[in-house]
Amino acid sequence: MGDDTSAWRFQKNSLPQGSVLAPTLFNLYTNDLPATKSRKFVYADDICLGTQASTFVELECSLTADMARMAEYCQRWRLKPSVTKTVASVFHLHNANASRELTVMLNGQCLKHDPKPVYLGVTLDRTLSYKEHLLKTAGKLKTRNNLLTKLVGTTWGANANTLRSSALALCYSVGEYCAPVWSQSAHTNLVDVQLNSTMRLISGTLRPTPLPWLPVLANIEPPALRRKAAVDKLLEKAAEHEDWGLHGDITNPPPYRLSSRHPLWKDLEPMDTTARWREEWKSASVVNSNLVRDPAIRQPGFDLPRRKWCLLNRYRTAQGQCRACLKRWGQATSDLCDCGEIQTMSHMVDVCPLTMLEGGLQTLHQADDAAVEWLSDM
């Protein structure tokens, strides 16, 4: 600093675990990794070698040769690769060889074969269906939904604003981790089921509630649209960075051969999430959809106390504690109202002379003072 030069210091205990400096220095130190036939994928101190071939023998020869080059490099620069932490995996659709293991050598030792390796937090499987990863993610979401339930009570529960912020931080951050990688999987419904439960907690709605209502009332875009937005964002970044490995895959993609596969570069057209959401809501055939003109805006009553917010949404979705619903669920023997008509949620607010609200469901949806007072009496 200035005219002074700092003295050399020998670090004997390496660097703290989890520090930013450690992977930065490692990347600088290993910036001249040797050329290999395999493609190298490096993130911090995780290095992955990936290659393609038409036979298992070719794969084994290529990877073993590349591992020998890496081992020589490590020995030259006083690095010691961990044989126990290094694994070999193979991805293919040939079911007859589903149990086939690769024989890849490193420093004279055969690497362990892992059929379901975890790389950067994503569990891979032989066919790259990501089913195992999505099962794990769904399990994590279920646990987090249980935590979110602690904030939900019929009388004292947190308001929708608090629940929405908590859900985005606690649940959606996990449910959408590396979403562009597995967004085209056939098993995304495993995650969607749990995210639907998250939105039910925010909106206070019941399980029979039509699914298109959940994102509208929770004021969160549908999971599929959020994943597509994440894919578009990644593709936009990859197109701008020519030094990214993904850039070449997008600008010069391999031939599209299998109809069961849906790679990211199959659909490069960016999507307007809000416009698509509005189109889907307009085409959705759900009860009382005429109440909502724009699904992307926060619906009236979002700041109401928990009990009134839940009750309001159950009238909106026509799924609540009316006798018609209770009879359908096996909780009541009769579906008749005290006025003699069949008691549905719309009957209670629109028609019933004992409980009707002046202006009906349209007035209730606006959640004005009269509507809130009516909800208090129900």
Regions found by a protein language model. Give the residues of each.
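Mobile genetic element proteins and their domesticated derivatives, centered on retroelements
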Residues: 18, 33, 45-47, 70, ...
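Short, conserved micro-motifs composed of acidic
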Residues: 65, 79-115
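Catalytic palm subdomain of template-directed nucleic-acid polymerases
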Residues: 14, 35, 48-72, 129
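Short Cys/His-based metal-binding microdomains
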Residues: 328-371
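Conserved pre-catalytic core of RNA-dependent polymerases
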Residues: 1-16
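Basic, alpha-helical interaction scaffolds
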Residues: 108-181
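Helix/loop segments that flank and initiate small ligand/metal-binding modules
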Residues: 262-343
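Active-site palm subdomain of RNA-directed nucleic acid polymerases
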Residues: 7, 23-54
